Amino acid sequence: MPQLIPFFFLNQLFYGYLALFALLVLVSWVILPYLLQLQIVRLLITKL
């Protein structure tokens, strides 16, 4: 189990934080604006 070998701790922390940052960027730049646009369109359609 490489998770228990201290040599791999820094590598796992680095790539773990890198993955979290990439997920945060993906959510904030792609997914949330799409959901906001979808919500606005639904609101405008119901107001017709």
Swiss-Prot record:
Its main location: mitochondrion. The chain crosses the membrane at residues 13-33. Keywords: ATP synthesis, CF(0), Formylation, Hydrogen ion transport, Ion transport, Membrane, Mitochondrion, Mitochondrion inner membrane, Transmembrane, Transmembrane helix, Transport. The keyword Flavoprotein does not apply. Residues 1-12 are mitochondrial intermembrane. It is found in: Mitochondrion inner membrane. GO terms for cellular component: mitochondrial inner membrane; proton-transporting ATP synthase complex. The keyword Nucleus does not apply. Pfam families: Fun_ATP-synt_8. Residues 34-48 are mitochondrial matrix. GO terms for biological process: proton motive force-driven ATP synthesis. It is a single-pass membrane protein. InterPro entries: ATP_synth_su8_fun (IPR009230). Coiled coil: none annotated. The modification N-formylmethionine is found at M1. One of its GO terms (molecular function) is proton transmembrane transporter activity. F-type ATP synthases have 2 components, the catalytic core F(1) and the membrane-embedded component F(0), linked together by a central stalk and a peripheral stalk. The central stalk, also called rotor shaft, is often seen as part of F(1). The peripheral stalk is seen as part of F(0). F(0) contains the membrane channel next to the rotor. F-type ATP synthases form dimers but each monomer functions independently in ATP generation. Belongs to the ATPase protein 8 family. Mitochondrial membrane ATP synthase (F(1)F(0) ATP synthase or Complex V) produces ATP from ADP in the presence of a proton gradient across the membrane which is generated by electron transport complexes of the respiratory chain. F-type ATP synthases consist of two structural domains, F(1) - containing the extramembraneous catalytic core, and F(0) - containing the membrane proton channel, linked together by a central stalk and a peripheral stalk. This is ATP synthase protein 8. It comes from Pichia angusta.
